[in-house]
């Protein structure tokens, strides 16, 4: 991403040496890309993939804004989500980063961990936030109508945040003085819940024990988040200048909204608040507030 003049962020990399940090950003937009056939006159200007191979390629109008970065990027073609062919072509956002055979028709839905969360398991302990999960519609949506592209190790959808101010406050606004007390209370509540669950487990059938174990796994993940928050609570938050940002922006102003969301991701990376981010720009099937974003911004 380019350096946005909106921000004057402290350089988090200065204290970490000169070794570039590896970051992962995954972005999803719905409804496909233009793929005109070679005999179609539109193929020259509007084919999604550049013409040519290796370094000797030419962008079409789809990607020509990336021309200044051509020596720093790789466009990959020829890949396929084979498991996605078993479901409707506009119902597979939930497979975008998991590539899981989620089931179709009468088969029971089952997903798996997404690429971003797998990477976050390796680098997430080095930053305040293991990952940043965002979308335009927010939340999780429904099966085949996902509002998120991030899934935990059990294949459960991770709710996405779509409110710029909420994202900014989470990243850069200091917690109140009661934060330590609330974290201690959360830890105590989780400890009691785990103790009660172990007693309950002795009275359950094998099937119910499996269901309880899945639930307890979520509780343990919450416990890990609480422990991590306690470790970072005395670490100062990055200092940023967002005076020129409109954090109350909504998708009703799509161009500014998208710019703001991408600027937040840039700033999260720049300050090393996280090294993993996902953003579902819109959802499939013409449902939700993001349906007309591309049309609105031209």
Describe each model-derived feature in a short phrase.
Residues 1-298:
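Ligand-binding pockets and gating/stacking loops
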């Amino acid at each position: 991403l380019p350096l946005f003049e909106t921000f004057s962020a402290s350089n988090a990399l200065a204290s970490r040496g000169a070794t570039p940090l590896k970051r992962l950003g995954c972005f999803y937009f719905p409804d496909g890309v233009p793929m005109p056939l070679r005999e179609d006159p539109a193929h020259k200007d509007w084919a999604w993939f550049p013409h040519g191979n290796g370094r000797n390629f030419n962008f079409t109008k789809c990607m020509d804004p990336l021309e200044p970065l051509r020596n720093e990027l790789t466009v990959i073609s020829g890949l396929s989500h084979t498991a996605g062919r078993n479901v409707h072509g506009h119902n597979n956002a939930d497979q975008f980063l998991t590539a899981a055979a989620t089931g179709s028709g009468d088969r029971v839905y089952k997903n798996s961990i997404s690429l971003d969360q797998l990477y976050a398991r390796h680098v997430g302990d080095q930053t305040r936030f293991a990952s940043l999960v965002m979308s335009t519609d927010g939340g999780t949506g429904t099966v085949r109508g996902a509002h998120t592209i991030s899934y935990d190790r059990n294949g459960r959808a991770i709710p996405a945040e779509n409110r710029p101010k909420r994202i900014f406050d989470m990243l850069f606004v200091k917690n109140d003085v009661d934060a330590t007390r609330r974290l201690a209370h959360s830890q105590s509540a989780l400890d009691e819940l785990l103790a009660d669950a172990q007693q309950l487990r002795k009275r359950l059938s094998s099937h119910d024990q499996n269901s309880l174990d899945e639930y307890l796994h979520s509780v343990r993940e919450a416990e890990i988040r609480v422990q991590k928050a306690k470790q970072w609570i005395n670490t100062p938050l990055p200092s940023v200048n967002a005076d020129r940002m409109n954090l109350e922006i909504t998708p009703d102003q799509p161009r500014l909204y998208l710019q703001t969301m991408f600027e937040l991701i840039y700033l999260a990376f720049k300050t090393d608040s996280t090294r993993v981010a996902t953003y579902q720009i819109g959802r499939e099937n013409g449902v939700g507030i993001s349906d007309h974003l591309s049309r609105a911004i031209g």
